[in-house]
A protein has these predicted regions:
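Transmembrane alpha-helix interface/packing and boundary motifs in multi-pass membrane proteins
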Residues: 225-230
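C-terminal-most transmembrane helix of multi-pass membrane proteins
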Residues: 269-270
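Membrane-embedded alpha-helical bundles of polytopic integral membrane proteins
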Residues: 1-224
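Short, conserved aromatic-histidine micro-motifs
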Residues: 209-217, 256-258, 263, 282-283
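Juxtamembrane boundary at the C-terminal end of a transmembrane helix
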Residues: 275-283
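Interfacial loop-to-transmembrane junctions
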Residues: 242-265
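Juxtamembrane interface at the ends
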Residues: 161-162, 166-167, 238-246
């Protein structure tokens, strides 16, 4: 079976699982708790291959998964804010443990440990902020439309950028880090996303899924934010891999590489979407 077929099958299954997972809050939580764990495990495994680095892979992964579930519990109104105390204790432990580990460069261990939480676990956890919101009656409601739309915009951007870049690409976007990306592709991808955002607004209005109450221009703004920060997220992961001297972050997804390869764009796009939507509430 050639790589194109493998990549296509993996991609279709990936999209199907992700879309299905968003339809139910329990399924979403379970799916992204797993994705968070696999991603933190992958990240810590990669940095541990660097000379002098020895991050506690198991505890970092457990901490990342716990943080995701804690944010989910808090955002859904199931648990109080005290749910974060065990996570904070774990972070303190990971810092103090370096005093006794006698590693040659504890600063690197601290930095990579915190990066596994800030760069990987935190963005995935912010999906809960997008999915759960307080209702007028005092209860907490779940809506899949915004978190799912973030991923739809990222997929549309990838496809649009690839098509436009292949046909029109002449000016390199960031040749030092990602030689294959062009300005033409990035702009084309952004235009596709803006059109897709208008489509999401129309369909959500028609079928009653626009729980967040965004108008068409606010949806288009969200699409633009996701496009810009998604592109930066892609470039950040490319820089990370170049620094480590690797092509793919892993091989868990046949034809697509590792978890970080598949979710790189979302790691900056999700927090940016949260900030954008919060900013709208202040205007």
């Amino acid at each position: 079976m050639n790589n194109f077929v493998v990549r296509t099958i993996t991609g279709v299954l990936f999209v199907a699982v992700l879309v299905t997972g968003f339809l139910d809050p329990i399924a979403m939580s379970a799916l992204f708790a797993l994705i968070t764990g696999l991603s933190v495990w992958e990240f810590t495994g990669l940095v541990n291959n660097r000379q002098g680095v020895s991050v506690n892979r198991f505890i970092s992964t457990v901490a990342g998964v716990y943080f995701f579930l804690a944010v989910m519990g808090f955002c859904s109104g199931v648990t109080p804010s005290t749910v974060f105390i065990p996570y904070l204790i774990t972070i303190v432990y990971l810092m103090v443990a370096e005093l006794y580990a006698k590693n040659e460069d504890p600063i690197h261990d601290w930095a990579y440990t915190m990066m596994s939480q800030m760069y990987v676990a935190l963005p995935f956890s912010m999906l809960n902020v997008l999915a759960f919101r307080a209702m007028p009656d005092g209860n907490v409601g779940y809506s899949f439309i915004v978190p799912l739309s973030v991923f739809v915009f990222l997929w549309v951007n990838d496809s649009g950028a690839y098509c436009c870049g292949s046909l029109l690409g002449k000016h390199k976007l960031f040749p030092r880090i990602s030689p294959g990306k062009s300005w033409e592709g990035s702009i084309g991808g952004g235009l596709f996303v803006i059109a897709a955002a208008a489509g999401v607004w129309y369909l959500s209005e028609q079928y009653g899924y626009n729980d967040v109450g965004l108008n068409m221009y606010e949806w288009m703004g969200l699409g633009l934010v996701v496009t810009v920060f998604g592109t930066w997220g892609d470039l950040v992961e490319s820089l990370f891999k170049r620094t480590l001297g690797i092509k793919d972050s892993g091989s868990i997804l046949p034809g697509h590489g590792g978890m970080l390869d598949r979710f790189d764009s979302s790691l900056l796009a999700i927090p940016a979407a949260v900030i954008y939507l919060y900013t709208l509430t202040l205007l």
